[in-house]
A protein has these predicted regions:
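N-terminal metal-binding scaffold of metallo-dependent hydrolase/deaminase domains
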Residues: 1-49
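Active-site gating loops and adjacent loop-to-helix segments of metal-dependent hydrolytic enzymes
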Residues: 82-113, 161-176, 235-264, 289, ...
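C-terminal cap of metal-dependent C-N hydrolases
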Residues: 15, 383-433
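Divalent metal-coordination and catalytic microenvironments
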Residues: 9, 27, 33, 64, ...
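Metal-coordinating catalytic core of metallo-dependent amide/deamination hydrolases
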Residues: 141-273
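Alpha-helical scaffold segments that flank or form the walls of functional sites
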Residues: 66, 84-155, 179-193
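His/Asp/Glu-enriched, well-ordered alpha-helical/loop segment
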Residues: 258-264, 308-393
Length: 433
């Protein structure tokens, strides 16, 4: 890959409390796909990138367009795309039994799975999501195909073959040995630690995993030093159920921790709507990341996650669409919904300020991106995951660059995203079929 310099209006967040803004700025990207430097003019870029040889790089001028970090979806169920926007009048547990599990059972058919996965990934591409933390299904072959499709597309993903062996339909229930064997196959095939697409250990949630399966998942994560994803404290009835199933655990989070699934390797837990007390302290101590899924939490009547409080406590946070509990794959909408949830919290407790735009943008980009490594910023050494936004149709002339970005986040859509990059490579439109 040839080293390049991109010229545009560049905006990103090194820190959560402010934007870095370079009007008509330049960002240099090395042949390894990483940012070498960012500056307001070429002379400053030359000083900053003394070893880069600016003169030999191709300069790509995006004119009056915005250049921002790409989006990261930190919690999404790819096999639920067919149910997107359906059964939104149910709470979590009946929604799982009546809609989600029957749909996921269809993924035993790899042809059906590929058709749905292509549709899912194309939508992600449209909305500028270049990295994802993804639930597959229990089916090894279908999960393998999903990982292959991400590789073919040039989009980054941590993809999990789901582990579950209780409180689920027979078609989705597999014994411990089969669950581990399927994961071992995928680890062998996609185990490159520097690969864009890698496995992530994925016990669905405590109610669907016996202690034996949870223990095996923890051992697998430790053996291969793989990340872990699951769900935590999403719904009050779910929390009560976990307390019945795991009476020796001090909290829902402790139920994972006892089996080596709560920060012993990099861990992300979706929702955490009701996380508090000892569970919160354990999460902070172990460095567990929260995937905040505002649309899903509203749709399934789960509650409002206290993201301002978690942020102030130093908890790592990213945003997730949680399709199909959530109804929208546009991650820019998640920024808006997360701010709105924060404002609802503010109405209940004026001691906590609601989230502002720089904070939520930082959460969605640099904070979320840290789960993949150095992703989500244009600081030197970061992988160049980026979007080019042509907001001319939104009449930008009267606005500052920050207001242009804010306006795009609130009222723009995929039609304004004209270029997408992942690890320095431009990502072409993936085939639907």
């Amino acid at each position: 890959m040839m080293k390049k310099i991109y010229k545009a209006h560049i905006l990103f967040t090194k820190e959560k409390d402010r934007f870095e803004v370079y009007e008509n700025g330049y960002v240099a990207v090395g042949d390894d796909g990483r940012v070498v430097g960012v500056a307001s003019n070429l002379d400053d870029l030359k000083v900053q990138c003394s070893k880069f040889n600016v003169q030999s790089a191709e300069i790509v001028d995006f004119g009056d367009k915005l250049l921002i970090p790409a989006m990261n979806d930190m919690h999404v169920h790819a096999p639920q795309v067919h149910n997107q926007g359906v059964a939104m009048d149910l709470e979590l547990l009946p929604w799982l039994q009546n809609y989600t599990f029957p749909e996921e059972s269809k993924y035993a058919d790899v042809e059906y799975a590929e058709r749905m996965y292509r549709r899912f990934m194309h939508t992600q591409w449209l909305f500028g999501t270049m990295r994802s933390v993804v639930f597959g299904t229990v089916h090894t072959a279908s999960t393998r195909r999903l990982m292959q499709l991400y590789q073919e597309a040039g989009m980054g993903a941590l993809v999990g073959k789901v582990a579950m062996n209780r409180n689920c339909p027979e078609a989705l229930c597999e014994d411990v040995e089969a669950a581990i064997e399927g994961n071992e196959q995928l680890i062998a095939e996609f185990g490159d630690r520097d690969g864009l697409v890698r496995p992530i250990i994925t016990p669905r949630f405590v109610p669907s995993c016996t202690p034996e399966l949870l223990k095996a998942c923890g051992e697998l994560a430790n053996k291969y030093q793989l990340p872990v994803q699951s769900h935590l404290s999403e719904n009050v009835s779910e929390i009560a159920w976990v307390a019945e199933l795991e009476p020796e655990s001090k909290s829902y989070g402790d139920a994972y921790n006892r089996y080596g699934l709560f920060g012993q390797t990099p861990t992300i837990m979706a929702h955490c709507v009701w996380t508090q007390g000892a569970e919160l302290e354990l999460m902070k101590r172990n460095g567990v990341m929260v995937a905040h899924c505002p649309t899903s939490n509203f749709n399934l009547s789960s509650g409002m996650a206290p993201i301002r409080s978690l942020l102030d406590e130093g908890v790592r946070i990213g945003l997730g669409s949680d399709i199909s509990g959530g109804h929208d794959l546009n991650m820019f909408r998640m920024l808006v919904y997360a701010i709105q949830v924060s404002k609802m919290h503010y109405q209940l407790n004026h001691d906590k300020a609601f989230l502002n735009l720089s904070e939520i943008f930082w959460i969605a980009t640099k904070s979320a991106g840290s789960f993949f490594g150095k992703v989500g910023s244009f600081e030197p050494g970061y992988e160049f995951d980026a979007l080019v936004i042509d907001d001319a149709v939104l009449y930008p002339a009267e606005y500052s660059l920050l207001h242009r970005l804010e306006r795009f986040i609130y009222v723009g859509d995929d039609r304004q995203i004209v270029h997408r990059f992942c690890r320095g490579q431009e990502v072409p439109e993936p085939k639907v079929f």
